[in-house]
């Protein structure tokens, strides 16, 4: 048997006295794709950060090739050929794509040629001279992967790499992963998507509560076994009565929808989209599908006031808000959950309690009790895993960070809730909770506009789906007509 590229033995780690890794063993072979699954807070990202030298273990040993280490640092990890592509791309927004890829990379005469080779291998059309701040999340992910490839990574860690990629981009990434396998690169593939895991990974490990509870060849396990290993208790995917009680929105909700739409958009044109019209009524969930670059996020950001439209008008409950500031639109009940929670959504070093109520701050003498009550409400309703409300958001897992952001949006008393990739980085067992949460919100006469790259999410959830292609609507599907094939056909500019 070939010597493994990587062996982690009895890795332990605590944060604030809470054990997040409990004696983890993990092995990666040359040319192997080893999938890593687990619920939010299971410890997947922490384990990978330890392997990449970003975090320091409390105990345990890492063996890379023939060398054993008690701990690594990022520079040493890079020297050893380890590269972590994080769940949230970490780019320098004011630098170009080329500068981001080559940052701190030793200069070589063949650097430009090597970079062009990598771009061709990825079949990547990204503009190297563009500013990183202009990139969609999918392109940011590609930049991170290119960083690793340019550093001759022998161990590549991909943390939810397809979370915001379209099917075409995902397949292109998979082709590159297979090419890397042929070069004996070992790949750790963290994902919640079982079809992708079965397509790529020969081996799988499942983590729960900081421990590896299942590990072996992927083909040896059924989907039900893998899901049950993550969530041992059978879950009813409908929200419990207790959860529904805790999710009752603040403020005065209308008991009956009005005879006019909550949102009305006429001939709206802006950066990335042209002449869009839209009406959403109270209690309706409208899906907005399309490929990355189709203009969905730009449209949502314009509705919220983050971008200035070139033409068109916007009404919220029959009051024109076209010229209102973002703050004014928020005060009127238009609430937006952004695509990238770490860059545009959360204050990572601030505590959970402050992040949750920041849209709806109480008077200072009420603040402590109010924040504690709000954190408790959403801790119960959404199952947010945290030690207490003073815990910095940065220390939470990606899925729990997303739940904090959702809690903030709900606490802002929305009339219209726009959610951009709401289940990005959220595990299999928690996705159903978010779907039911959106249904519960809509049942309280809130209008919901949902953007997602995972078109499967719209089936059975959206009342109707609008599909965008190159900045325009390519079609609209009623609830009974919503299928993955029809949405993808429209997304590529075809006729459903």
Curated annotation (Swiss-Prot):
InterPro entries per record: AAA+_ATPase (IPR003593), ABC_carbohydrate_import_ATPase (IPR050107), ABC_transporter-like_ATP-bd (IPR003439), ABC_transporter-like_CS (IPR017871), P-loop_NTPase (IPR027417)
ABC transporter domain sequence ranges: 6-234, 255-495
Annotated residues for binding of ATP: 38-45
Primary residence: membrane
Enzyme class, spelled out: translocase
Cysteines paired by S-S bonds: none
A GO CC term assigned to this protein in UniProt: plasma membrane
The reaction(s) this protein catalyses: ATP + H2O + (2R,4S)-2-methyl-2,3,3,4-tetrahydroxytetrahydrofuran-[AI-2-binding protein]Side 1 = ADP + phosphate + (2R,4S)-2-methyl-2,3,3,4-tetrahydroxytetrahydrofuranSide 2 + [AI-2-binding protein]Side 1
Entry's localization field: Cell inner membrane
EC number of this enzyme: 7.6.2.13
Keyword set, alphabetical order: ATP-binding, Cell inner membrane, Cell membrane, Membrane, Nucleotide-binding, Repeat, Translocase, Transport
PROSITE patterns, per database record: ABC_TRANSPORTER_1, ABC_TRANSPORTER_2
Keyword Membrane belongs to the record: yes
Organism superkingdom: Bacteria
GO molecular-function terms, A-Z: ATP binding; ATP hydrolysis activity
Its membrane topology: Peripheral membrane protein
Homology family: Belongs to the ABC transporter superfamily. AI-2 autoinducer porter (TC 3.A.1.2.8) family.
Its biological purpose: Part of the ABC transporter complex LsrABCD involved in autoinducer 2 (AI-2) import. Responsible for energy coupling to the transport system.
Subunit structure of this chain's protein: The complex is composed of two ATP-binding proteins (LsrA), two transmembrane proteins (LsrC and LsrD) and a solute-binding protein (LsrB).
UniProt-recorded name of the protein: Autoinducer 2 import ATP-binding protein LsrA
